[in-house]
């Protein structure tokens, strides 16, 4: 089992720390809000960074979306692109997949899948998952906001600097 083979992710992987979050969010500031000062930007987004830092942490692929999933010849799911893996918010990969930049999913389906994921964590004996559904959904939305701000910054950088506008579609 993949999860069991990880051992202690916290000891083996870099942590998705506040400073790492700021590094990623700065991509958004630099490429989407170049006239906003770093001080003003940090003042605006500090509550997001602090809130994300409080979400329980687990192994985080960090680039878990449809283009990194493969159907292997054995009809098993293959996952690629692990080089960015970290120890971070438990909902980060879930939101990366369910609110994938390349696929539009129905909100009702997303809500059901988030609830199902939370129940699986509870069934696995993970005490931190025993929070109100609204709180778990809040963790999901916060991680999604941070991730998508980073993605918007990266996609805008690809458009402006690298002349690759297709990512913005």
Go through the PLM ranges and name each one:
Residues 1-36, 55-57, 86, 167-168:
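A cross-family kinase active-site recognition segment
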Residues 19, 65, 85, 104, ...:
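Short, solvent-exposed segments of well-ordered alpha helices
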Residues 161-169:
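Regulatory N- and C-terminal appendages and interdomain linkers associated
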Residues 26-35, 90-128, 142-162:
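Active-site activation/catalytic loop segments of kinase-like enzymes and analogous catalytic loops
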Residues 37-47:
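Central P-loop NTPase core of STAND/AAA+ ATPases
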Residues 2-3, 46-94, 104:
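Active-site acidic catalytic loop and adjacent metal/ATP-binding pocket
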Residues 11, 15-22, 66-71, 86-88, ...:
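Glycan-recognition and catalytic cores of secretory/periplasmic carbohydrate-active enzymes
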Residues 127-138:
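Histidine/acidic-rich helix-loop-helix segments that form or flank divalent-metal centers
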């Amino acid at each position: 089992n993949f999860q069991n083979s990880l051992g202690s992710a916290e000891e083996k992987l870099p942590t998705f720390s506040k400073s790492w979050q700021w590094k990623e969010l700065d991509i958004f500031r630099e490429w989407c809000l170049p006239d906003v000062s770093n001080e003003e930007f940090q003042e605006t987004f500090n509550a997001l960074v602090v809130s994300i830092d409080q979400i329980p942490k687990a192994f985080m692929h960090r680039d878990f979306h449809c283009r990194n999933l493969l159907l292997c010849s054995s009809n098993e799911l293959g996952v690629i692109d692990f080089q960015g893996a970290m120890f971070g918010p438990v909902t980060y990969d879930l939101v990366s997949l369910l609110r994938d930049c390349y696929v539009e999913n129905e909100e009702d389906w997303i809500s059901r899948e988030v609830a199902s994921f939370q129940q699986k964590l509870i069934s696995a004996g993970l005490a931190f998952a025993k929070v109100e559904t609204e709180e778990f959904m809040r963790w999901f939305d916060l991680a999604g906001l941070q991730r998508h701000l980073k993605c918007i910054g990266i996609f805008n950088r690809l458009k402006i600097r690298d002349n690759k506008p297709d990512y913005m579609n």
